[in-house]
Amino acid sequence: GDDEIFEPWWGVGVAWDCDTPHTWGLAAPQVDSTNMGGFRYEHPIKTEADYERLAVPTFSYNPEKTERALSRMSDLLGDALPVRLTCQPPLAAMQAYYLEHLRGMEALVNDLAFRPELVHRAMAKLTEGILRATRAAEETGLLTANHHEPMSCSDPVNGQPADGRVRLHNLWTSVNSQEFQVISPAMQEEFLLSYQRPVLQQYGAVQYGCCEDLTQKIELIRRLPNLRVFVCSAWTDLDKVIERCGSSHTIMWRQAAAAVTLPDDLSAYQQHLNEGLRKLQGCHYQVVLRELETLKGHPDRLKEWARLGIELAERHA
């Protein structure tokens, strides 16, 4: 009953070699912390001096590894499903995610406030690495279109290439700023968006946002190059997003999973969804439910949710 898309083929991604033992030159080992699967990272940047150990990676296409992976999957699937090579850049404009992984959230926030020059140097290195990765992917000539995926389903971005060769401006990219949730708009512009922008301008279509509250940053995000989808999380003010975005961008209205999966029935949630879709009349929008951890004993809840969403969307079409 929903619109999850499954292609009639199995994709095998290109194999990349990286000239650093760890992507940014530093290992961030995972440390298990609970019997239920919880874990934490051992962040390798612990001092100011550690920032200088950040390395800018260079990626290269490995045809032998790629061919072996294709062959293995073809042998496994046989005639059941065709196998295709897929290729996307090995890094995206997720500088805040990469740096938090290396430094840790509390330390990163302190650095933004008291050691901003360190953050700027780190962001510059991360951006250089991302740009190298995107150029390397495009130069292989193997990039494959990604407009058929569930979160970025659209017509071909910037049309079908006349020569058949997909380039970055034919691709979607999806990025966010969750680690900057508590950072001011001005500091987000200075320390993140200014570094994301050179990467995003190479792509044909951009989706921005995830679970962060972007209410105070709507105008900043709207000015990003090639923005097509503004993600309005369950914590972002939908009214303000509609007011600023109107029909100029697609609004991806994400639902709070707990509101859908935990109650005994959907009656209270139905009021919320109905009111939101009423407000979204005249806009281009998507309603997305993700980040599910449990159905709390309601095995049919997702089917119920999909039916309800379709019914209310048709009512307010």
Feature names for model-found ranges:
Residues 1-10:
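Ser/Thr/Asn(+Pro)-rich, low-complexity disordered segments
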Residues 2, 16-18, 77:
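Generic hydrophobic/packing signal
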Residues 10-25:
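Terminal, charged accessory segments of proteins
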Residues 23-33, 90-94:
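Conserved oxyanion/phosphate-binding beta-strand-loop segments in alpha/beta enzyme cores
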Residues 33-71:
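A gly/proline- and charged-residue-enriched helix-loop-helix capping module
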Residues 56-317:
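Active-site loop segments of alpha/beta catalytic cores
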